[in-house]
Amino acid sequence: LFRSVLDGKVGLEMAKRLEGKGILMLASMEGGFRNMINNKKPVSSPADVSGVKYRVMQNPVFIDMFNSMGGSAVPMAWGETFTAVQQGTIDGLEIPLAVIDASKYFEVTKFLSLTNHTYSAIHLLVSKRTFDKLSPDQRKAVVDAAKQSLAEQRKASADNARQLVATLQSK
């Protein structure tokens, strides 16, 4: 579904708007889905967020989303988050599986809930001015490399997500 959005009309409109700002979008890669981890309870429905203090990005959309589900959104700088979970200042947070694993959040949280509540795209962008300075052969090589890397990155992202689910659920 998300790939069809990024590769379809929405993605084309986004690319068109960016180009109007002097930026070319070469590809929309996957950052994966964000999931919830906490020390209070598993989350299988929005109602389960109620009563749980979640670290969220300092962004009104995320703050409103968690507060509207009955949780307590705690905007917090990323660098403070691990210690805040460890000390009980917050109960949990929402992040991609790869970050849960790499940052070892499984060591300080009890519940991993595969909520997939937010999808993160990673856009491969280049300045139009810089791109236009390249020779036609160089431009073709850049576009071809972007297309090839897109397919490889999306496959690797999906494979990595499957592996991380198994790894994290075993911890």
Q: How should each PLM-predicted stretch be described?
A:
Residues L1-F2, K9-K171:
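N-terminal secretory/targeting leader peptides
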